[in-house]
From Swiss-Prot:
InterPro entries named in the record: NAD(P)-bd_dom_sf (IPR036291), SDR_fam (IPR002347)
Record-listed NADP(+) binding positions: 44, 68, 93, 120, 152, 205, 209, 239
Protein name as it appears in the record: Short-chain dehydrogenase/reductase
Entry keyword NADP: yes
Originating organism: Phomopsis amygdali (Fusicoccum amygdali)
Keyword check for Cell division: no
Assigned EC number: 1.1.1.-
Keywords on record: NADP, Oxidoreductase
Listed SUPFAM superfamilies: NAD(P)-binding Rossmann-fold domains (SSF51735)
Family the UniProt entry places it in: Belongs to the short-chain dehydrogenases/reductases (SDR) family.
Length: 334
């Protein structure tokens, strides 16, 4: 599962991280900046949106449920009454590829810039979960394919914003998970993405999170250093007490909260570091595309990192192959 002692050591450090250094007090005034946070109606997405808004940013609260999103917006506004920023609901359903373009068009009808796309939304689907609208396994279809399509459709705006913005400030953040450590050797099997050979619910979730990492690596290669200047980085937000764990028993939840789980704001700090810290550059993420909690440079499992790298760098080229596969899946919806 972990492959080597170094991988185990890295995973252990991400389960029990040091206190965060990069928090609300670390970021400047964000007036004039525009952000999208998917899954912003609850958990770390809601916490992140609150931090950005408190610094006068305009934040698009992207979520499926308008009622839940509006409740989150009202909560955040009440918590930060002096903000000069804005919170705007953006309807999005990542489990339906046919609906994503209309969400992007709704955003583009209001904005000409996008400073950071926080791909925060995700599901942790049980084994008997229904498939997506297009028939994909729910974790893969929502967390990976839907998120990829959203990013692809917003990429021209990100690239255009980067032309007139400070170096390395325009970014795409991919929220992965420590669950990648439960994936198979190399991260994922390109020949079994339809799951004709069934896998456990944990493995399916892990594969979807490996997919986020692979997409981040390939976007960084195509549009980062020596290209268009968009920083793309994946992260493990940390072990958090969020709605993703709503299907756990009360006993499991109590034990995890006591020993392992942290409040969602800590995960928001991980995303905040990835999205705004000047320590992160397009050059840096070409070599190491993984941020751990609560804003630390870490390493993903060695065999996944090796598989993702281009063949020209001694890797297996999996990031490029998975990118091309995903492009084929979303082609009818672009």
């Amino acid at each position: 599962m972990f492959g080597s002692f170094n991988s185990l050591k890295n995973a252990w450090a991400q389960v029990f991280p040091q206190a965060p250094d990069f928090t609300e007090s670390s970021i400047p005034d964000l007036l004039g900046k525009v952000y999208i946070v998917t899954g912003a109606n609850s958990g770390l997405g809601k916490e992140l949106s609150g931090i950005l808004y408190s610094k006068n940013a305009k934040v698009y609260v992207a979520a499926r449920s308008e009622a839940k999103a509006q409740a989150a917006i009202e909560f955040i506004k009440a918590a930060h009454p002096h903000s000069k920023g804005d919170l705007v609901y953006l309807q999005i359903d990542l489990a339906d590829l046919s609906a994503i373009k209309s969400s992007v068009n709704a955003f583009l009808s209001q904005e000409a810039r996008l400073d950071v796309l926080f791909n925060n939304a995700g599901v942790l689907a049980p084994h008997d979960a229904p498939k997506t609208a297009q028939g994909y396994e729910l974790n893969l279809g929502t967390n990976t394919i839907g998120t990829f399509l959203l990013t692809k459709l917003l990429l021209p705006t990100l690239l255009n914003t980067a032309k007139s913005s400070p170096k390395d400030s325009v970014r795409v953040i991919w929220v992965s998970s420590i669950a990648v450590n439960f994936s198979e050797q190399g991260g994922l099997d390109m020949e079994n993405l339809d799951y004709h050979e069934d896998k456990s619910a944990v493995t399916k979730y892990a594969v979807s999170k490996v997919g986020n990492f692979l997409h981040s690596v390939e976007l960084a290669r195509r549009h980062g250093a020596n290209a268009d200047g968009v920083v793309s980085v994946a992260l493990n937000p940390g072990n958090l007490d969020t709605e993703l764990g709503r299907d756990r028993s009360w006993l499991e939840t109590k034990i995890l909260r006591t020993f392992v789980l942290y409040p969602p704001v800590f995960g928001a700090y991980t995303e905040l570091f990835a999205g705004l810290s000047d320590q992160i550059t397009a050059e840096m993420v070409r070599d190491n595309n993984w941020i751990g909690p609560w804003g630390r440079f870490c390493r993903i499992r060695e065999d996944i990192d090796q598989a993702a790298r281009p063949r020209s760098e001694g890797g297996h080229g999996l990031a490029e192959r998975f990118w091309r596969w995903t492009e084929e899946q979303v082609k009818p919806y672009v």
